[in-house]
Each structure stands twice: as structure tokens, then as C-alpha cells.
Amino acid sequence: MNLRSKVDSQPAYVLHSYPFRETSLIVEVFSRDFGRMALLARGARRPRSAIRGLLMAFQPLEIAWAGKGEVLTLMKAEWQGGLPLLAGEALFCGYYLNELLMHLLPREDAHEQLFASYAKMLALLAADPSGKVREADLRCFEKALLQELGYGLTLNHDSDANLIEPDTFYTYRIEQGPVRIDHGEGATQVVRGKTLLDLDAEDFSDPRTRHEAKALMRMLMAYYLAGKELETRKIFKELQEL
């Protein structure tokens, strides 16, 4: 339970919002110093509400709240400007990031470094007018997210404490990290040592590294999401089938 009666001038981003009663919203925000918070925006759905147009995803805000309990009351929201609206692939990617944070971040658990990584990622997504997304940027954010949650990847040594060898094949096991295998041994998820080292160095110049790193991250996210299917991924699949 949140015991802080009032917080002012807190940098934050909207992750998700949904209607509450006739004229209000429950807004899930990611704040710099308090982590994920649930706030009641009273009257935000009224046509003349001063904050109705401000509570948008992917835009930097400065907010204030007051109250006690799990859902606090939003007192103020000011747009900090500077980011174009996301479009195309970047918009889907932004919603993907928000879903990850909604599902994986516990409430009221501060992650200042992750907040900075999220803000940087949004700036990168907004920087390309075509809405294209660099896979390298997405992999770096996913890696930072897991690190912040205490699920940091082991990428430079294997389960036997041996240094990762670029030309050796491994399978990645959640509780053990990279486990050396003979290529073709039948593991469901196989990754080159070079890919692990590239991911550690955040070097995605090799196309095969990008492909294998994507598969590895997808497996890890599925595990930590504990079976929850992300809406963004489902919608993207449906669009590809049209």
C-alpha cells in the first residue's frame, strides 16, 4: 500500500488507461522514482477536461498525485514536449514495450535506470519518420529490462564456468544460462557462441546474430510472461496474414 500522501513534479509516461465510471479514467503510468503506478484521473473523459488530450502513451509527462492505497488520485499532468507521435512499426513496437512493462513490472517498484532506457527507446522510435524499427535497439531494451528485473542474462561463460567460444553451439536454459551442446543434438533452442558474445557487446552487425538473438529473447520473454500472450504480437500476426 502506498503511504505517500502527495508527490509533485514526477516524470512519467502513460502505459495504459481504461474507463472508470462515467467520466473518469484509471491510468497506469511508469514514473521515474516510483515505478509503475495506478492513478485515478477524475473527469478525464469529459469533453472539456484539461488533461483529456495529455494522457497519451509515448509522450513525456510531468505529473502529480495524492492519496493512499493502490489507486491514487492524479492531481496534475503537464506535457513535456519533444517527441513526435509514433507511427508504423514504431507504434506497434511502442505498444509491445508498454505491454512488457505492464506485465513484468510490479507496482511501486522504482527502476530509474529502466525509466531512462525506456525514454531513450521511445526517442529512437520517434526519430525515424518512416516508423521503421532497428532490431538492435529493441534487443538492447529487452536485455536492459531483464537485467533490471533481476533476470540478467549470462552471456560470456557457460553453465560449467567456461568462457563462451564463438564457434561453439549452446542452448540457453533459464536457471543455468548457456549449456554447451553438439550441433544437431536436438535442443529446441540453439544459439552460436558468437551470438551470445555479440549480444553481450550489443553488436548486431551480423544478420545471423540478429536472427538468433531475436529467437532467444522471444523464448526468454515467453518464460517470464508465464504464458500470457501479448496483444501486440497477436495483432501483428493477424496483420501479416491479411
UniProtKB/Swiss-Prot annotation:
Keyword annotations: DNA damage, DNA recombination, DNA repair
One Gene Ontology cellular component annotation held by this UniProt entry: bacterial nucleoid
Pfam families (alphabetical): RecO_C, RecO_N
Domain of life: Bacteria
A GO BP entry: double-strand break repair
Protein family according to the UniProt entry: Belongs to the RecO family.
Name listed for the protein in its UniProt record: DNA repair protein RecO
Taxonomic lineage of the native organism: Bacteria, Pseudomonadati, Pseudomonadota, Betaproteobacteria, Rhodocyclales
Gene transcribed to yield this protein: recO
